[in-house]
Curated annotation (Swiss-Prot):
Subunit: Monomers and homodimers. Binds to NTRK2/TRKB. Can form heterodimers with other neurotrophin family members, such as NTF3 and NTF4 (in vitro), but the physiological relevance of this is not clear. BDNF precursor form: interacts with the heterodimer formed by NGFR and SORCS2. Mature BDNF has much lower affinity for the heterodimer formed by NGFR and SORCS2.
Any one GO BP annotation for this protein: modulation of chemical synaptic transmission
Disulfide bonds: C141-C208, C186-C237, C196-C239
Protein's organism: Felis catus (Cat)
Major location category of this protein: secreted
Maturation propeptide residues: 19-128
Compartment(s) of residence: Secreted
Protein name per the record: Neurotrophic factor BDNF precursor form
Amino acid sequence: MTILFLTMVISYFGCMKAAPMKEANVRGQGSLAYPGVRTHGTLESVNGPKAGSRRLTSLADTFEHVIEELLDEDQKGRPNEENSKDADLYTSRVMLSSQVPLEPPLLFLLEEYKNYLDAANMSVRVRRHSDPARRGELSVCDGISEWVTAADKKTAVDMSGGTVTVLEKVPVSKGQLKQYFYETKCNPMGYTKEGCRGIDKRHWNSQCRTTQSYVRALTMDSKKRIGWRFIRIDTSCVCTLTIKRGR
């Protein structure tokens, strides 16, 4: 149901002449999980600034509504059974594919966009001009995101604290697919490797640190039992602060 809904949404925006995105490239057609979508362009680049300004409000509201429906549909479709073989399909940072995914997970992008709109809580025009890219804003910590395979991870820690082996391939009806994990971690080559950006170093010690969250993956425990388990992967780069003593 979720995959069908995704296909309808992508087709809908692909057919619109005055869409917020000029193009939507869908890659990873062999994947069983959510395809990646990259969007470019604005209304002004399609029909000119006047036409764009007239339709911007209604289209933005429509897009937000579609995002909310998509996220609600994903929540309803999450399986309740612990050992369901489809469990990984409902984790936005996990994908089964025959090749390396070329884009971030779709739900990952939609959740980021929805969170941004909720936080802004402004008119459409103000939202556009409050885009961090337009204001030259920078992140407190520099992070990098990439797809990694089970061959890269090999082992992981599950929710019980035990070490499990992450299986590289998952059997499906037509063969096998690889497990891919979309990980985010602090950039060791970034400008924030020696401290967080924008922090007053006279009063604070700061450090950018990679944090982890749980995702569903096909694994094997120490007793050779294979099953779907929650494992920890790198999911964000955050700033930690400690006050300097003696001040």
